[in-house]
Amino acid sequence: MTNLTNILGVGTLMTDAPLLSDDSSKAWVTVGELRTMVEAWRDQLAGPRMLVFHYIPNTVEGVAQLLGASSAGHVIALLDPKLPAQAKADLVDRYRPGIIFDESAVRLQGTPCDLHPDLAVLLSTSGSTGSPKFVRLSASNLDANAWAIVKVLDINATEVACGHLPLHYSYGLSVLTSHLKAGAPVHLTEKGFLDPSFWPQMKRWEIAHLPGVPFHYTTLRRFGFTKLDLPELRVMTQAGGALDMRTRKIAHDYIDARGGRFHIMYGQTEAAPRITTLAHEDFIAHSETVGPALPNGGIEIVGANGAPGTEGEVIFHGPNVMMGYAENPTDLALGDEMGGRLATGDIGWLDEDGRLTITGRAKRMGKIAGLRVNLDEVERALNSLGEEFVVVQKGEVLLFYHLPNEDMDALKQRALKQLSDRFTLPKTAYKFKEVDEFLRTSREKINYQALN
């Protein structure tokens, strides 16, 4: 049983090295100061091994709680603090966690459960909907992912990362773990790109590494990359869904002119989460790809005839592949069910040098602002109102097809309330469209492909 503090190297770094800051910080929290915070939480949480629900904020204290709970030997489920109260209650009822961190309060339930010795962290498969289905990750999974990211992005101890992505989101967590692995500082923030104070704050903390999902890069394109006042910025990374080619090129050209690097990446929470990274120098010739597999992983295309360029399901092999899923407390006792092999559910092909191009998704999972959304789960929530809705993703919005109704305004208001009560996506992510009938297949099933 190995805890995250040991694997990420926090215990071995120079004591006075700057490591973390957040929105309330006046100065960097050093390795030694963080170590003291972690040890305090470890001692407070000492006792039988338990499941911890951590509605984790992007703060130094939130990270100290995570590492402290891990040091005490507990398993931590990282959850969205903005989840509606009912969604939180449903998760607690299902899993009965022994410890809950929520809004700076700590509740000790005192409920131990059977946890596999290798299990370290749980991440939701659809964080914005509070899905009860978790990805089970070992400390070794997270360590392998962090090591590979450090290597492929060449992260060094002087590179300050912007920790604006939520820590319950696998991409946000990987920014933190990879930089801790390299001994590199991270400035954590709860602010977003559209907050007027965000950019001056990034300049103040001398941000060199800016990660983002398609929403962030589209926003920067509209705002104007050249208006960014970040003198230290050298690395930009993009994951969390497909970015349109125009925005890819603008981002690449902007950072290239500064002597920096732009990396397109691909991953899944089930891979802790990184699978591929496109090198900056390969962008011009291979901008449509997401790059080759990580140094410690490999990709095969199932259903293809073996020739480069032949489409099939993307299968990833690597030490960062999850242990498996959990849908109830009993599953938390299970060991590794994957054997380092992940069937991604995505369709794609490899070129002669092993670079992957993604051409589609085989499952009904979407991504809005980088957050994974189970479209079937959203659809079920609306259909519980007694009206039939069909949901598909269109770019950065969810489009709800519905049949004519005598009082459409009232129906939309009921639908929006149901969505806001259950999920954390903003109302701007929801659009409605009236149709006379739903397109269906010959088996009378909804034809989602045609609607898309």
Language-model features: locations:
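Conserved AMP-binding/adenylation subdomain of ANL enzymes
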Residues: 143-160, 170-209
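Conserved C-terminal "lid"/linker of ANL adenylate-forming enzymes
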Residues: 366, 396-399, 417-452
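Conserved AMP-binding/adenylate-forming
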Residues: 40-82, 164, 372
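Gly/Ser/Thr-rich phosphate-binding loop
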Residues: 207-212, 221-285, 298
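Conserved pre-ATP/AMP-binding loop-to-beta segment of ANL
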Residues: 2-4, 8-18, 108-124, 131, ...
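Conserved AMP-binding A3 loop
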Residues: 27-32, 119-147
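Conserved AMP-binding/adenylate-forming core of the ANL superfamily
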Residues: 15-46, 88-89, 140
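Conserved ATP-binding/catalytic segment of the ANL
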Residues: 313-376
